[in-house]
């Protein structure tokens, strides 16, 4: 009898505990969710902080705005230094080119330039990149911005080439999103998308992959 009593008591307690857990689980999960929401809330910048960040963005954009020009074949120079005779260097990399594309669409998003200038700059950059000598579709790591020739020694950087293709996907998404709102520029946008898609499809990373060291 004692054994039966213990069994029934254990069974009832077990059932009771399960019942309590079943009842309070929604409350526990709700509390956890609220705590996560509080932790993930983004603290917004005040006006002074926002003005400060925008000012930095404008001054950063000035570099691209000044040097993305016909003189440099719309290939953004690698760097600029005030304290040397030749302040600007006549070389660029695939990562630099990709960053210049992102700088252009960011300048549009921040309303530093209008949509027409944005599309014109993207077109000038991409049409010049089309004419650059490549290896299996991959951009070489360094080019002369005046002659558009690869710098010696010629080599491919998997990191920089991968960066560039990643930037192309970002620009592609941007163009697809703005196309709906800009019917007057639809043909130009379609042409840019065609250039980008061809560049992505023609960039072959397989020769850079070492199958013996997976």
Question: Where are the language model's segments positioned?
Answer:
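Acidic, mature catalytic/reactive cores of soluble proteins
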Residues: 1-213
